[in-house]
Amino acid sequence: MMMQTITQSGAGMAGAQAIHANVYATQPLAKFGTKEQLEETIPKIINGTWRTCFGVTEPNTGLETLKLKTTATKNASGDSYSITGQKIWITCAQVASKMILLARTTPVEEVKRSTHGLSMFCIDLDRDKPGLDMRKIKKMGGRAVDANEVFFDNYQIPANTLVGEENEGFRIILHGMNAERCLLAGEALGLGYAALERATQYANDRVVFGRPIGQNQGIAHPLADAYMKLEAAKLATYHAARLYDASRTDSSIPFHSVGVACNSAKYLAAEAAFTACERAVLTHGGMGYAMEYDVERYLRECLVPRIAPVSREMILNYVSEKVLQLPRSY
C-alpha cells in the first residue's frame, strides 16, 4: 500500500525505488541476522542513516541465480572474505551504505545440490577501499534513481558480515525475493491508477465534435476495462502481501504457496499497469506523446515491473510447474 501510494502520487518508479530496497532487501537480514548484526544495522536503516541495495543480479547469469559467479573466498586468517565479481542493475548503489550481497562460497562443481554453495552477506560499500568500482547505467525511465554495474576485485569484508550459515544463502535470500515481488506489484498498481486518473481527466476535458471524448464508448470502454484489471490485480497483490506476512509466523503455510501468490501478483499488476498506461497515452492522442502531460513517463516506467525482478515468462513457468504440476520447461 505504501509503494502504491508513492507511485500513484506522481513520484512514479523513481520515488518508490528510492526506498524500496530498504524494505525488501532487509527481510532476510531481519530473519536470519545475528543479534549483533540487527542491533548494528536495523535502527540505522529505519531512521534513514543508512540506505541499502540488493546485490544479486549478474550480467552473465540473469535469472540463473544458482549459477552466480561472484566469489567470496575466506582468507587464511579466517576473519575476512575476499569478494571478486560483478553485479548489475543494482539500484541506489551510488548512495547506499550497505549491500545485501549474494556470492559463491563453494564452487558450483563441488556442491552436492544446486541450491547449495551461495552465501549472503551484509557488507559496507566503502568507496574509499580498494577493490570496489561502480558505473551508472543510463535508463529509459526512473532516471531520478541510479542503477549500476558494481565491480569487486578482491574487495575485503569482515567474516562477521556473513548472514546465516555459509553456503545457505540462496535459501535465505528467497525471503527477500517474495517481498520484492509484492512491492513491485504495489508500485505497478500506483502507476496504473495515476495514468488512469490522467486519462479520465483528459477524456472529460477534451471536447471534440461538440462533446467530451469520454462520452464515446471507444474511449470510455478501454478505460473502464483498465480500471477493472487494476482492481483485480490489487486484490491479488493484497492477498499475496497478507499471505507473505502470515507465513512469517504460521509454519503451516507452504513456502511455494507464498511464492505463487507473490509472483502472480507481480505478473497481474504489471500487466494491468501496462494496459492502463498505454491507454492513457492513446486517450491523449498526440498530446500523449508530449512530456507535458506525464503519461508518456508512466508508459516508460511501467515497463520496469514487467521486466524486473523476474520476467513474465518465468512467472508463467513457475505457476505451470508449482500449481498445475506440468513438466518443467527450462
Regions found by a protein language model. Give the residues of each.
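Alpha-helical interface subdomain recognition
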Residues: M1-G10, A16-I19, F32-Q37, K44, ...
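A short, Trp-centered hydrophobic/proline-enriched beta-strand micro-motif
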Residues: N47-V56, L102
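Active-site-adjacent elements of ketosynthase-type condensing enzymes
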Residues: P59-K69
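Long, acidic (Asp/Glu-rich), low-complexity accessory segments flanking structured domains
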Residues: N154-I172
